[in-house]
Design a protein with these regions (language model features):
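N-terminal amphipathic/basic-hydrophobic helices that include classical n-h-c signal peptides
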Residues: 1-9
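Alpha-helical ds-nucleic-acid-binding substructure associated with the helix-hairpin-helix region
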Residues: 30, 34, 63, 67-141, ...
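Short, charged, surface-exposed loops that flank catalytic or proteolytic processing sites
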Residues: 181-187
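Conserved small/polar residues in nucleotide/adenosyl-binding loops
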Residues: 212-215
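Short, aromatic/basic-rich helix-turn unit that serves as a nucleic-acid recognition element
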Residues: 53, 57, 61
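Active-site-proximal or metal-binding-adjacent scaffold patches in catalytic folds
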Residues: 11-44, 133
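Catalytic DNA-binding helix-loop module of base-excision-repair DNA glycosylases/AP lyases
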Residues: 58, 131-176
Length: 215
């Protein structure tokens, strides 16, 4: 069994993953080989919502390796802090952000996020009290924050259990590989298959991605 570590995971002391995989296997026996091949830990929450959304923007449409390097260099700008607050970010010159590898659109997007967090500070502190759909509706009001970015926030920050980002390319590739499809599945095809995985679709977003690393 290959054990894969995602960002923001912890040892599954409470058995969340075990419970989820048992349910998923009962709902979809074809997943047996996947669960025998891959082992993942439980998700752990991220308390800094601003950091989480900025990170997802940096990772948009980039490989994990490339995005990780850019995000590391970005954080080094603010060496005295573990992560800048929205005001610090807005004070940072465009050229400084550009120098670490951020594109101009992404610089504008994270500035939009910073401005929105300043304006809606109290509202955003209570995001976890909202439903998944309410959070998507609220955060996608920010220019540059699309459904995928919010889905990453729901999964890796709030640890919501039933998120399935059908537009994620790595997930689509893993889905194609595991189910031995000739072509990349459409978002509709993935959504139809994923119906049987409710209410644990988040974990079925992680397993296929891990599977691609083994092939």
């Amino acid at each position: 069994i290959a054990v894969y570590k995602f960002m923001f995971v912890k040892k599954d002391k409470m058995g969340t993953v075990k419970k989820a995989t048992q349910y998923l296997l009962k709902s979809d026996p074809e997943l047996y080989e996947l669960f025998e091949t891959i082992d993942i830990d439980a998700l752990s929450p991220e308390k800094n919502y601003f950091k989480s959304i900025c990170r997802s923007i940096v990772y948009q449409q980039l490989s994990g390796k490339s995005a990780g390097k850019i995000f590391f260099r970005f954080k080094k700008i603010y060496s005295e802090k573990s992560f800048p607050d929205p005001i610090d970010l807005l004070k940072t010159k465009h050229a400084t952000l550009k120098a670490v590898g951020l594109s101009s659109p992404k610089i504008n997007y994270i500035r939009n996020v910073a401005q929105s967090f300043i304006k809606n500070k109290n509202k955003y502190l209570k995001l976890n009290e909202l439903s998944d759909s309410q959070i998507i509706e609220e955060l996608t009001k920010i220019k540059g924050v699309g459904p995928w970015t919010v889905q990453m926030f729901l999964m890796f920050t709030l640890n919501r259990l039933d998120v399935f980002p059908t537009g994620d390319l790595a997930l689509r590739k893993g889905f194609q590989l595991y189910f031995k499809l000739d072509d990349l599945p459409t978002e509709k095809e993935m959504a139809i298959r994923a119906e049987r995985w409710k209410p644990y679709r988040t974990y079925m977003s992680l397993y296929p991605v891990s599977y691609t690393h083994l092939r």
